[in-house]
Amino acid sequence: MKQVIAARTDIGMGQGKLAAQVAHASLNAYEYTDDRAVRRWKDEGQTKVVVKVGSERELYERSEEAKRAGLPTGLISDAGRTQLEPGTPTALAIGPAPDADVDQITGDLSLF
């Protein structure tokens, strides 16, 4: 079991902004995960992996692919209070879910 969080590289987020957006996405997807999967994920150490996506379009494509596969997702758009325009999509979490299921959607992405 793992969760993969994809963050955009094309919008110039600072390190703090990146960390916050990844955290928001992780928690958002977690909230939509069934209790049994959450227990298993926690028992296995709550693995989280952060990867790169190069565009808004790619973020949305991965989100739709995960939804079609029945995986929990959390797609985050920034509030626009600091670095980004309001509503800018920043990060997508997929899972927690079985490793192989998440890897089908994110396995080709580079680590952050």
Curated annotation (Swiss-Prot):
The keyword ATP-binding is assigned to this record: no
Top EC class, one word: hydrolase
E.C. no? 3.1.1.29
UniProt signal peptide: none
* Family note: Belongs to the PTH2 family.
Catalytic activity, reaction form? an N-acyl-L-alpha-aminoacyl-tRNA + H2O = an N-acyl-L-amino acid + a tRNA + H(+)
A single GO CC term, please? cytosol
The protein's superkingdom reads Archaea
Q: Which SUPFAM superfamilies match?
A: Peptidyl-tRNA hydrolase II
Report a single Gene Ontology molecular function: peptidyl-tRNA hydrolase activity
**The protein's name in its UniProt record:** Peptidyl-tRNA hydrolase
- In its UniProt record, which GO terms are filed under biological process? translation
Note the Pfam families from the entry. Answer: PTH2
The UniProt entry, under HAMAP family, shows: Pept_tRNA_hydro_arch (MF_00628)
| Cell compartment(s), UniProt | Cytoplasm
Keyword Hydrolase on entry: yes
Swiss-Prot/TrEMBL keywords:
Cytoplasm, Hydrolase
Q: What does this protein do?
A: The natural substrate for this enzyme may be peptidyl-tRNAs which drop off the ribosome during protein synthesis.
Broad class of the protein's primary localization: cytoplasm
Q: What are the start and end residues of every segment in region (Disordered)?
A: 64-99
